[in-house]
Each structure stands twice: as structure tokens, then as C-alpha cells.
Amino acid sequence: MTADRNMRRTVVGRVVSDKMDKTIVVLVETYKTHPLYGKRMKFSKKFKAHDENNTAKVGDIVEIMETRPLSKDKRFRLVRIVEEAVIV
């Protein structure tokens, strides 16, 4: 069973919202190369992720992992906080 759990997709992104209880919104940015012109273009996507202890804050860099559907929109869960946000 643990081998299947580790095969799930993990992504790293930045927390853009933590206003919901036990839920964070993570912005994940990826780069793709244009097939004809070869220019690298930036694409971004937002994922809602489950944060059981409400530990992640806005601006944190986090790692999230794919999981079973937890609600209508939540398909990811928080694995760890890679880097905490700098408060100025």
C-alpha cells in the first residue's frame, strides 16, 4: 500500500490564500516550450489543498501531494512547508 501512496503526483507551489478552515490555495507555476517557436512560456494553476493543522500561511512555499477527493475542489493534501514566508 505505501508504494502506491508514494507514486502520487507531488508539486511545489506558493500559498496564495489561507482564509478557509483547514484549506489552502496553492499557486503552481510551470514552464512549457512553444512547439514551433521554442520560446518558454510560464503557466500557472491554483490547487486547493487540505491543511489539517492550519500551519501554512500566505507566502509560504509548500509541497502538496495528490490524494483522494476530500471535497468538491480539494484533491491535494499538504506534505510539508519547504520555506516559510518572510514577514517584513
Swiss-Prot record:
Highest taxon in the source lineage: Bacteria
SUPFAM superfamilies (alphabetical): Nucleic acid-binding proteins
The entry's keywords: Ribonucleoprotein, Ribosomal protein, RNA-binding, rRNA-binding
Family assignment from sequence similarity: Belongs to the universal ribosomal protein uS17 family.
Chain's gene name: rpsQ
GO molecular function: rRNA binding; structural constituent of ribosome
GO biological process: translation
Subunit structure: Part of the 30S ribosomal subunit.
Coiled-coil blocks: none
Protein name: Small ribosomal subunit protein uS17
One Gene Ontology term, aspect cellular component: cytosolic small ribosomal subunit
Function in brief: One of the primary rRNA binding proteins, it binds specifically to the 5'-end of 16S ribosomal RNA.
Keyword Nucleotide-binding carried by entry: no
NCBIfam families tied to this protein: PRK05610.1 (NF004123), uS17_bact (TIGR03635)
InterPro entries per record: NA-bd_OB-fold (IPR012340), Ribosomal_uS17 (IPR000266), Ribosomal_uS17_bact/chlr (IPR019984), Ribosomal_uS17_CS (IPR019979)
